[in-house]
Amino acid sequence: MAGVTLEQVQSYQPMEEGYRQLVGILSKYVNKFDKRDKMYLVGYNNAGFDNNFLRALFTQCGDKYFGSWFYPNCMDVYVMVTPFLMGVRNDMENFKLMTVARTMGIEIDENKLHDATYDIELTRDIFYRIIGKMDVKL
């Protein structure tokens, strides 16, 4: 899947070790005992996909306090971009990250697709295009 071989998957660290490393990183930025100090989960189609896997990781590692780290509402660029593409959606082949980025005028390097860092960069670029189209003042 996504160019990852079985051998690569088998060489990964144990799930619990990855969980401990993630919590260590989160602990640097979030006081899990302060209900107003949390992170937003941000991604592309993360609301219906990635967030569930991350929550399951916490559960499988015996951590019932996923909500101590993250706000319950996430920022899903997949959902956020939808109203901006309503006029062309019927003409789009699909709503995958690459297709949406290209439709938003973002140059794509197909050799880098499904690389985690590159996908984050594309998601960020789509988000910036969305923000550029909004007239919101906070």
Residue ranges and their predicted role:
Residues 1-51, 102, 114:
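Conserved non-catalytic scaffold segment of RNase H-like nuclease domains
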